[in-house]
């Protein structure tokens, strides 16, 4: 988070993360309008991150070059880590935010729920996915996305943003719908949690710090 000349907080972050497995640049603006531009080399993951940024009303640009010739795992995991880092950085001292958010998202036969506490204490609980998502691949005609990584995405996001994140699937059948409903539920919960609260000027904690 940076500040303008007038002292108004600008809740933006840029993260550059490079390893032998991936090269990532993320630009995030929490006070955006849902303008999203994502290219990770994994088309279904692009689709999920586009949904997340759009439904959170974040302006989000993601550029990832990963070793997808091996598999998508490193690319997806590392991008989720960097996105969590960007979220944590953009939140700054967390003054004036609502802190908590939750959302139920239906997608046809599926219903998912997410709850967020921007607590500074990283934790993730992920429950309810049907067993068949442990071995489902969503591929189209390009680099496949293995739905077994869904939990890892949410864990990586939560740990690196330093938030408590609970995600659950109440019911569902189609792997695409189940996965997308979860991403959208997380997006809507984050949108609520990071929104400015007009009734709060300081840090929303009795401890005075998050």
UniProtKB/Swiss-Prot annotation:
> What is the E.C. number?
4.2.1.19
**What's the family?**
Belongs to the imidazoleglycerol-phosphate dehydratase family.
Major localisation: cytoplasm
Q: Which NCBIfam families match?
A: PRK00951.1-6, PRK00951.2-1, PRK00951.2-4
Question: What HAMAP family does this protein's entry cite?
Answer: HisB
Q: Which UniProt keywords apply?
A: Amino-acid biosynthesis, Cytoplasm, Histidine biosynthesis, Lyase
On the tree of life, the source organism's domain of life is Bacteria
What is the species of this protein? Mycobacterium marinum (strain ATCC BAA-535 / M)
Question: Protein name, please?
Answer: Imidazoleglycerol-phosphate dehydratase
Q: Which reaction is this enzyme known to catalyze? A: D-erythro-1-(imidazol-4-yl)glycerol 3-phosphate = 3-(imidazol-4-yl)-2-oxopropyl phosphate + H2O
Q: Does the keyword Cytoplasm apply?
A: yes
Broad EC category? lyase
Q: Name one Pfam family in it.
A: IGPD
* Pathway terms, separated by semicolons: Amino-acid biosynthesis; L-histidine biosynthesis; L-histidine from 5-phospho-alpha-D-ribose 1-diphosphate: step 6/9
Recorded hits in PROSITE patterns, A to Z, give: IGP_DEHYDRATASE_1, IGP_DEHYDRATASE_2
Q: Which GO terms describe its cellular component?
A: cytoplasm
Alphabetical list of PANTHER family matching this protein = IMIDAZOLEGLYCEROL-PHOSPHATE DEHYDRATASE, IMIDAZOLEGLYCEROL-PHOSPHATE DEHYDRATASE HIS7
A GO term, aspect molecular function:
imidazoleglycerol-phosphate dehydratase activity
* Compartment(s) where it occurs, according to its Swiss-Prot or TrEMBL record: Cytoplasm
Give a GO biological-process term: L-histidine biosynthetic process
InterPro entries named in the record: IGPD_sf, ImidazoleglycerolP_deHydtase, ImidazoleglycerP_deHydtase_CS, Ribosomal_Su5_D2-typ_SF
């Amino acid at each position: 988070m940076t500040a303008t000349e007038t002292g108004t907080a600008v809740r933006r972050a840029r993260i550059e993360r490079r390893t032998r497995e991936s090269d990532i640049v993320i630009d995030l603006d929490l006070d955006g309008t849902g303008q999203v531009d994502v290219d990770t080399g994994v088309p279904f993951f692009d689709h999920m991150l586009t949904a997340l940024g759009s439904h959170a009303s974040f302006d989000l640009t993601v550029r990832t070059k990963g070793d997808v010739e091996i598999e998508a795992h490193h690319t997806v995991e590392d991008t989720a880590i960097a996105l969590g880092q960007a979220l944590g950085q953009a939140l700054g001292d967390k003054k004036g935010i609502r802190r908590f958010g939750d959302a139920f998202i239906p997608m046809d036969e599926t219903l998912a729920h997410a709850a967020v506490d921007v607590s500074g204490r990283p934790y993730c609980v992920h429950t309810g996915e049907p067993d068949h998502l442990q071995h489902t691949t969503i591929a189209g005609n390009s680099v496949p996305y293995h739905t077994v990584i869904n939990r890892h995405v949410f864990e990586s996001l939560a740990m690196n943003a330093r938030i408590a994140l609970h995600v659950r699937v109440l019911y569902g059948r189609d792997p695409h719908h189940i996965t997308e409903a979860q991403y959208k539920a997380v997006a809507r919960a984050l949108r609520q949690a990071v929104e400015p609260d007009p009734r709060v000027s300081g840090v929303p904690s009795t401890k005075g710090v998050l």
